[in-house]
């Protein structure tokens, strides 16, 4: 690149693993004993087992009636060099009903020297000789990227996007207003944000994106970040084969048709059978399965039913020439028995990478869900389909699935669905579960014969299908417990040595920052314990991690955009979050985002909730840094809220409504309507409800283009005065630890 990235010089510490290679050459004089040999000739195979390895059990093929088999099969194990690693070699005899153990021997792997290749002879029952070839090497390359910097693909995209944006911005602003835009270095980084809020957020964001696309604002944006419901629209848009040549107008028409049907139609016996088969295939391959998988299929069938095989990686073609803004998606990693408001790690997803900035660990999207150990893939699975990720990104709705389908007791006078979703924030969603300890090490020996195994799988599949069918009518923990509905994947940080975590603002103490008063951080927005444990590390010993909807901590994806590496100047934020009424203040989620940012030493403009008392409810609010000289890295935020104000009177900016039909169409409340057509848990939108919400947010966006233009011009000026967002010398760059094992208690 043409510039120096200081973040690439920050070292993210990690320890290298060892690769232990075993080649099973041959065996001679395989015997079942004198009596056994008289009855049958052995069908030998070899099992290799290292209890301390993550992918701990491997086996050779078997030979029928062969006492001198030659295998020449090679296997690799990834090992932690700090563990006492021992290889257990078991000679087995394959039988139809139950395989028989013929003998076992062990080899201490620590006796091998690094770089050494050694031939070893093992003896079984004083008769059988087996030849192995062993070697031990340092695994110098990993499948995780350890870095605080953006990946090279995103850096390249950003440079290309700047060049593309320059002409688009001149066209949008006009010649007079863009005269200060002389080079691509003057181009500000603009991000568009969409909140959660179920189909309400998705439909509202559809209207927003149509307005941004047709007005030219979208061509000026570098990033689009979404959370929960907004990610569903982004997924629909970016997976569409005709986007961006075909714009949101046509795609939104398809979306309206898709969401007009009852979601219960997706639970027909034929489709349920297909869901069960897909889940069985995933489970039998060794991947964890929860109801989030089913929910993702339902969302996918609704929104992208003709492209269910598409993946996140497929979106690369949409940004290959920086022709579109880079889409960013998010979910949370949460801990057992801890509220999401107290502890949550933000996981970011892009077509280039998936990872957690807090730990400086990232991977290509096709590896997410695979088995890792110490940064290396030990078992790779096919890339998860996009619909699985859509289920994870919006998993709050799978957690309350009974309420979504409307199958709860109609006479229950309990909390409303909106209140119940809010209550989830204050409780721990998942608990410690024994399934995390399941591993290959617990699999019984002697079930490797192919015919017997196939018969076993068929019977297991039948019983599992029966259990799933029972689950669909509400008789399974998979459906009836919130934990069973949270997403779960293999822990890609398993076995890493987390001596250090890294602040999302790793150079914060080297840059000019706004001082933050302690009582400002102590002030509660939603709960006294909010963010209390965000400095804690992930459990690197847990084999699986829970991933849930990011809206369970706060409902705006600011953590993705506030990473200083992205250097965002202007954020255009759209909040579709539920409020008690249409007249309620609309700042709860952005206040939580502000507090989170301050706790992570990330620049964020002061959010003054009193502006609501002074100015009342507006379509959008602008929050700027008070002093750009002392807060030079602080972005400007244009915060759009869900409000029906001018839309009641105007069908387009400056064009009044005239007919009664036009006025009746726009005369509606969002949160005060007793029929709750725009409830977070409404998964069916008749055409009129869709058009109302879609057109409202399209209007609100277009009605404030002058606000966007003004902020854009100010951002150009700011960029020109501060061409580098990271004014720090490389000589002063060093790793900035958030915590280490010795001083963790000082930060929690």
UniProtKB/Swiss-Prot annotation:
Residues 431-459 are annotated as: Disordered. This is Cytosolic phospholipase A2. InterPro entries: Acyl_Trfase/lysoPLipase, C2_cPLA2, C2_dom, C2_domain_sf, LysoPLipase_cat_dom. Ca(2+) 1 binds at residues 40-41, 43, 65. The active site is at 228 (nucleophile), 549 (proton acceptor). Residues 1-178 are annotated as: Phospholipid binding. Keywords: Calcium, Cytoplasm, Cytoplasmic vesicle, Hydrolase, Lipid degradation, Lipid metabolism, Metal-binding, Phosphoprotein. Residues 6-124 form the C2 domain. It comes from Gallus gallus. It comes from the Eukaryota. GO terms for biological process: arachidonate metabolic process; arachidonate secretion; cellular response to antibiotic; establishment of localization in cell; glycerophospholipid catabolic process; leukotriene biosynthetic process; monoacylglycerol biosynthetic process; phosphatidylcholine acyl-chain remodeling. Residues 449-459 have a biased composition (Polar residues). It is found in: Cytoplasm; Cytoplasmic vesicle.
């Amino acid at each position: 690149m043409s510039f120096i990235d200081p973040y690439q010089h920050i070292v993210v510490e990690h320890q290298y693993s060892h690769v232990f290679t075993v080649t099973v050459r041959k065996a001679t004089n395989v015997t079942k004993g004198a009596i056994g040999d008289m009855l049958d000739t052995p069908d030998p195979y070899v099992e290799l087992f290292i209890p301390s390895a993550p992918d701990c059990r491997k086996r050779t093929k078997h030979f029928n009636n062969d006492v001198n088999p030659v295998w020449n099969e090679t296997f690799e194990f990834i090992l932690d060099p700090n563990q006492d690693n021992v290889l257990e070699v078991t000679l087995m005899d394959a039988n139809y009903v139950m395989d028989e153990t013929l003998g076992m021997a062990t080899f201490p792997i620590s006796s091998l020297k690094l770089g050494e290749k050694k031939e070893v002879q093992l003896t079984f029952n004083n008769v059988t000789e087996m030849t192995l070839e062993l070697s031990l090497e340092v695994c110098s390359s990993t499948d995780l990227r350890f870095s605080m910097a953006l990946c090279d693909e995103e850096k390249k995209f950003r440079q290309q996007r700047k060049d593309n944006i320059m002409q688009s911005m001149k066209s949008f602003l006009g010649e007079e207003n863009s005269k200060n835009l002389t080079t691509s270095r003057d181009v500000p980084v603009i991000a568009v944000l969409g909140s959660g809020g179920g189909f309400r957020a998705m439909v509202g964001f559809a209207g927003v994106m149509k307005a941004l696309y047709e007005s030219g604002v979208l061509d000026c944006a570098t990033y689009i970040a979404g959370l929960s419901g907004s990610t569903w629209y982004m997924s629909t848009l970016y997976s569409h084969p005709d986007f961006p040549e075909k714009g949101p107008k046509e795609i939104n028409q398809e979306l309206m048709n898709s969401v007009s049907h009852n979601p219960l139609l997706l639970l027909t016996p034929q489709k349920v059978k297909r869901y069960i088969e897909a889940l069985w295939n995933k489970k039998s391959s060794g991947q964890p399965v929860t109801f989030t998988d089913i929910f993702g299929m339902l969302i996918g069938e609704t929104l992208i039913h003709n492209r269910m095989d598409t993946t996140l990686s497929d979106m690369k073609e949409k940004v290959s020439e920086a022709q579109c803004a880079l889409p960013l998606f998010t979910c949370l990693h949460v801990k057992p028995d801890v509220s999401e408001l107290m502890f949550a790690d933000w996981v970011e997803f892009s077509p280039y990478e998936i990872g957690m900035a807090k730990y400086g660990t990232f991977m290509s999207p096709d590896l997410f869900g695979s088995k890792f150990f110490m940064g290396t893939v030990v078992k790779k699975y096919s890339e998860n389909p996009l619909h699985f990720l859509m289920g994870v990104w919006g998993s709050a709705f799978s957690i309350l699935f009974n309420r979504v389908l409307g199958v709860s007791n109609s006479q229950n006078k309990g909390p409303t669905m909106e209140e119940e979703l809010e209550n989830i924030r204050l409780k721990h969603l998942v608990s410690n579960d024994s399934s995390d300890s399941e591993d290959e090490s617990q699999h019984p020996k002697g079930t490797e014969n192919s015919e017997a195994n196939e018969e076993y799988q068929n019977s297991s599949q039948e019983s599992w299908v029966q259990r799933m069918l029972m689950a669909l009518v509400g008789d399974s923990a998979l459906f009836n417990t919130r934990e069973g509905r949270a997403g779960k994947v293999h822990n890609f940080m398993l076995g890493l040595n987390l001596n250090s975590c890294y602040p999302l603002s790793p150079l914060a103490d080297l840059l000019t920052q706004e001082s933050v008063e302690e009582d400002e951080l102590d002030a509660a927005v939603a709960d006294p314990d909010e963010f209390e444990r965000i400095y804690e590390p992930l459990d690197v010993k847990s084999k699986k991690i829970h991933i849930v909807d990011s809206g369970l901590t706060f409902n705006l994806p600011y953590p993705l955009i506030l990473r200083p590496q992205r250097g965002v100047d202007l954020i255009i934020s759209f909040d579709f979050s539920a409020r008690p009424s249409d007249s309620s203040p609309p700042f709860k989620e952005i206040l939580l985002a502000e507090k989170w940012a301050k706790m992570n030493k990330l620049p964020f403009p002061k959010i003054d909730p009193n502006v609501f008392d002074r100015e009342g409810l507006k379509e959008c609010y602008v929050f700027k840094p008070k002093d750009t000289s002392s807060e030079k890295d602080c972005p400007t935020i244009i915060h759009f809220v869900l409000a029906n104000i001018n839309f009641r009177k105007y069908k387009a900016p400056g064009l009044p409504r005239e007919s009664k039909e036009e006025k009746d169409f726009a005369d509606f409340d969002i949160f005060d309507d007793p029929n709750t057509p725009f409830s977070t848990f409404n998964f069916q939108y008749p055409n009129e409800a869709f058009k109302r919400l879609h057109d409202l947010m399209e209007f609100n966006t277009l009605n404030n283009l002058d606000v966007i233009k003004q902020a854009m011009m100010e951002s150009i000026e700011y960029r020109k005065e501060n061409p580098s967002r990271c004014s720090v010398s490389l000589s002063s760059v060093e790793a900035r630890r958030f915590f280490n094992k010795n001083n963790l208690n000082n930060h929690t």
